[in-house]
């Protein structure tokens, strides 16, 4: 294909108008005639039309670029958060394994192998979900952050600064920085 066939209709019209204007100006200059006011007016209109077409073309190119950029961002987000629903469904499984370990009788020698198996299963599950961007929110003695914490209660404490997480009742999780589930926490307040 030639370069003319690849151009958009706006570019072709714009170039044709420019060429016609240049030829008319050259013809007028060659003949040495004085410029007729009507010709000058038409040349001015032509120049204005050419300018409008250029601006319109630039706006169209900018709009296409914006659409392309937005589409790329949407695709990137879709890839990044495609596992969000699946990840949210795994959280109760993680919670149940942690509860099983918390309630297990660690002094019973007969249960030691089972407890070790549950611990290894939990560790391997946390490692697997961690590879895909899931992070645990379970820190204590950090300032309360309403973006990742859900305050279940406020307790007076001399040991903790006010508005700090004292205790985590249920761990929270994020997926690539987006909250999957807030951590349910007890928040400290100053003694009255």
UniProtKB/Swiss-Prot annotation:
InterPro entries: GrpE (IPR000740), GrpE_coiled_coil (IPR013805), GrpE_head (IPR009012). It is found in: Cytoplasm. Residues 21-31 have a biased composition (Polar residues). It comes from the Bacteria. Residues 1-34 are annotated as: Disordered. CDD domains: GrpE. One of its GO terms (molecular function) is protein homodimerization activity. Gene3D superfamilies: 3.90.20.20, Head domain of nucleotide exchange factor GrpE. One of its GO terms (biological process) is protein folding. Keywords: Chaperone, Cytoplasm, Stress response. Belongs to the GrpE family. Homodimer. NCBIfam families: PRK14139.1, PRK14140.1, PRK14150.1. Participates actively in the response to hyperosmotic and heat shock by preventing the aggregation of stress-denatured proteins, in association with DnaK and GrpE. It is the nucleotide exchange factor for DnaK and may function as a thermosensor. Unfolded proteins bind initially to DnaJ; upon interaction with the DnaJ-bound protein, DnaK hydrolyzes its bound ATP, resulting in the formation of a stable complex. GrpE releases ADP from DnaK; ATP binding to DnaK triggers the release of the substrate protein, thus completing the reaction cycle. This is Protein GrpE.
